[in-house]
Amino acid sequence: MESRAITQTPPARSRRRASVGQSAEGSRWEALRSSPLLLSTIVCLALAALSAAILPTVPSYDPWSWIVWGREIVNPHLGFSTGGGPSWKPLPVLFTAPFGVWTAGAPTLWVITARTGGFLSLVAAYRLASKLTTGAPWMRAVAGVLAAAGIVLTQEWSYYMFRGTSEPMLVGLALWAVDRHLDGKRGTAFVLGVGAALIRPEAWPFIGLYGLWLWRRDPRLRWLIVVGWASIPVLWFGPPWVGSGQPFLASVHAKDYNGHLGKHPFLEVLRRGADLQILPMLIVAGVGVAIAWFKDRNKLWVGMAAAAAGWWVLVVAMTLDGYPGLERFYLPAAGLICVLGGASVVRIAQFVSSWLSARDGWAQRATLVTAAVVAVLVILSIPLSTSRINEARAQEPIAAAAVKRLDHLAAAVRAVGGHKGVYPCKVSFAAVNHGVQTALAWKLAVTLGRVGTSMRHSGVMFVGPRDTIDGSPPRIDPRLTQQKLIAQVNEWKVYRQITPGHTACVGG
């Protein structure tokens, strides 16, 4: 008997559904591939979430204040007050407000968000340095890796990443704005620039000028420009006005901060800008820009260098106007310098190679010479970068100690009865080491103004070690002469500090 192979052809409708499903899946993947920012964000968000699971994760002083303000915005039972803490920053609170709905997870969610921005800055640095570099793919890859490494080795970068500050996110926004502009995505570039302007005021002139250029270049985006421009003053000045009655409170707080600029603020702020990125990166960036201009008249290189210089000018001018001139204010400029530096290492190597190739017998060795010069430049930079490498390695145990310290502070809060134990009345008061004031306000579910860094009234005083995590213990008003230890949890001591006879509404 002859056997027959029997096959079953699926109905036409099933074939169409399968085809449509495959087509939809393919189109989604193509959409991701065509949107490097979206794809990078997904990957960096996953990395940030993973880092929160395996690395110490706790906010530092300023981020705790943003988390407190976010909770106040979404919680009708808490008053919204921007006094008693650091300067207001709009962009972080746009994230921490929705995070505040999930109180327990808000601090971790914010740190994940900040780290996502930091990882994105490294991707953007890689992309930009690769775009600045011509030649073989390995040359573009080397330029990108060196640029990203330069950012990682900027001063305090690892601290910012561990502790959830906004600076890595700021660098990411600035570099991705440049990347999107170069790829012709001008609307996205403008939105990213607005995001940077909602973190640092130095970005305001840049987004203003870019918006004017875009207004003439692409009339379809004028509505976006108007909304973006309007959002900057509304979000910077509106919430402080509502929360304190002072729309310019952020500026007041910033000017009140002691920047320790010494007798020569101008020279000191310049030194800080130069010291932010590692010295080899600054040097090779300068040499690379010079080669790009005098050899090729490359406007892109010079434009990026001019943007970095312009940011420097703004930081210096604001410092001379009374602002503290901290190193981190320069970070977007440092990001551009690292991009130029990474590309410059390859550019310098190519320049040397082309010079040697003009000689007999060297033309066939151009690639080898380029690789050798890159290797020499990298090796020469290592001794000048070891201190930053050591600083970066030290941040993990420091962050782990901070996690443990704040866990002990939370236990001390529970030991004295939590919010009700510390604040039996609306006028009750508490104080703590200045470095954890905002963290204690979060744990006690109060506004920042109800937790002091000095015992100026009768109340409850939390005293921890004097170190880089907690800062100095609270100063005590001389009138508060009676002190009673009411709890001790590990390194934390909790006192009831009062003026004799004034015990009403004192917790503990």
Q: How does the language model describe each region?
A:
Residues 42, 141-142, 226-234, 284-285, ...:
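Signature aromatic-anchored transmembrane alpha helix within multi-pass, membrane-resident enzymes
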Residues 65, 206-208, 220-287, 310-314, ...:
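Membrane-lumen/periplasm interface segments of specific transmembrane helices
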Residues 161, 167, 199, 205, ...:
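Hydrophobic/aromatic-rich transmembrane helices and adjacent perimembrane loops
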